[in-house]
Regions:
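Extracytoplasmic metal-acquisition and chelation regions
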Residues: 12, 26-319
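Bacterial N-terminal signal peptides that target proteins for export
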Residues: 1-14
């Protein structure tokens, strides 16, 4: 009797298992919205700045385990890799960084790892060189702050798709689909930004910040950009630079100037006092905001949230 009962239970168990497998298969492939996942587990990816990490997450989706070295408020110009950072880079299957010497103090590490066979990609490599801006001061390299011209930053998606696909060919179709979706989202974001900027008359579109991170922003959305420091925060501004900026503010009757989340605000506060102009708010320049911090329905810890926060802050302060 016990033997018959055991066989019956076994048959029921096998039947239940088959039903579970059938349901799982339908759930995974029934919609046809994305290709089936490979069996290799999540691809381990390490990225540098918050903007690059966001880009990797957009393209990689649930097939990638992405970790960023830099968080909110971190200045990549001055960032030096710690021992734990190097360990994380060594443990990654793919490394993405922004490039154009934004992470200047880490360049040697990237080059050594690439020579050692590690998959290392500068996401800005897929941006045409003739689209890059060069500072008037005769800097030997282009302005690295390309993420503020949304259509330009969207071209970086191609490098991310390629880098992930090279490491995990079985998921290439998945990464390609997500890359195209990310480009569409950025095209929509750019159109929103253009319309938001147009709420300001051209004569009021003067953006004054701590360092020269917004030239691409100015080109894309019609702002004259004036900064106290150059494209890198490594070189500090002198007294003559501050006096010149104060004169410019007074002459042009600028209504507000702005501090940056990744740059100490002391000099801009001093300019504000000397010129008698208000500080219009804090902009995200070299890093996004804190993930999960919501503002007007968008997450400040995302690329979309960064762009929308900056446009809203600037337009509202200069109206």
């Amino acid at each position: 009797m016990k033997r018959v009962l055991s066989l019956s239970c076994l048959a029921n168990a096998l039947l239940a298992g088959a039903m579970v497998l059938t349901f799982t298969a339908c759930r995974d492939t029934g919609t046809g919205s994305s290709p089936p996942a490979s069996n290799a587990g999540k691809l381990r990816v390490t990225a540098t700045t918050t903007m690059v990490t966001d880009l990797v997450k957009q393209v990689g989706g649930d097939r990638v385990e992405a970790q960023g070295l830099m968080g909110a408020g971190v200045d990549p110009h001055l960032y030096k890799a710690s021992a734990s950072d190097v360990t994380r880079l060594q443990g990654a299957e793919v490394i993405f960084y922004s490039g154009i010497l934004l992470e200047g103090k880490m360049q040697e590490i990237f080059e050594k790892m690439a020579k050692g066979g590690k998959r290392v990609f500068a996401v800005t490599d897929s941006i045409p060189k003739d689209k890059l801006l060069h500072p008037a001061g005769g800097s030997s390299h282009a302005d690295p702050h390309v993420w503020f011209e949304v259509p330009l930053w969207a071209q970086s998606i191609d490098t991310v798709v390629k880098g992930l696909s090279d490491a995990r060919p079985a998921d290439q179709e998945y990464f390609t689909q997500r890359g195209e979706a990310a480009k569409k989202a950025m095209a929509d974001l750019h159109q929103w930004a253009v319309k938001r900027a147009e709420e300001l008359p051209k004569e009021k579109r003067i953006l004054i910040t701590s360092h020269d991170a917004f030239s691409y922003f100015g080109r894309a959305y019609g702002f004259e950009v004036v900064a106290l420091q150059g494209i890198s925060t490594v070189v500090e501004a002198g007294g003559a630079d501050m006096a010149k900026l104060v004169d410019f503010i007074k002459k042009n009757k600028v209504q507000a100037i702005f501090v940056e989340s990744s740059v100490p605000p002391a000099t801009i506060k001093r300019i504000s006092e000397d010129a008698g102009v208000k500080i219009g708010g804090e902009l995200f320049s070299d890093a996004m905001g804190t993930p999960g911090q919501m503002e007007n329905g968008y997450d400040l810890g995302t690329y979309e949230g960064m762009i929308k926060h900056n446009l809203d802050t600037v337009v509202n302060a200069l109206k």
